[in-house]
Amino acid sequence: MVILTMFMVLLILLSINVPIAIGLAVTTIIAMVMKTGTSFLIDTAIVMFDGSMKFPLIAIPLFILAGSIMNSAGISRRLIAFASALVGFIKGGLSMINIATSMFFAEISGSAVADVAALGSILIPAMKKKGYPGAFAAAVTSSSASLAIIIPPSIPMIVYAVMAQSSVVQLFVAGIVPGVIGGFFLMLAAYILSLIHI
């Protein structure tokens, strides 16, 4: 009965052009009320409050703050200069610089969003100016920023460690080698694509 009601409510909401996320939320709330009454609201509030009181979660806003401070202080440009000295001489150097800088920035901020915000506004226009296609520049920037999920200190790793009751330190150690390997293969792919297209 509950499943049939959920399905019907979702179809009705979607047919009257309610956004999918809101439709799913309303459907879920109706199903919870049908199944348990309104007591789930109190339980949900308690669980959310208890979940927010975990000590490792304090690191998340601090990593975001550190990334914001570094961006406003101009550290992004210094990281780009350092990466340029390391890999800028290779064919497709600007895409290599993009990937290396994203890896360095991921090691500092732990956030893929902060990585894209700090480096994308600098590197994408620079890559376009050097003749890289805009889609390629955006793809390199976004894919290299996704390494921040793997390279420690990673915000998703902290959240996972809290939820799974795992060791944050062990997860960070486990992310080093895959992050470096992922960065290497991204650089290899960027090099091959640069040979073909640029």
Identify the meaning behind each predicted range:
Residues 1-196:
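Alpha-helical transmembrane segments of multi-pass membrane transport proteins
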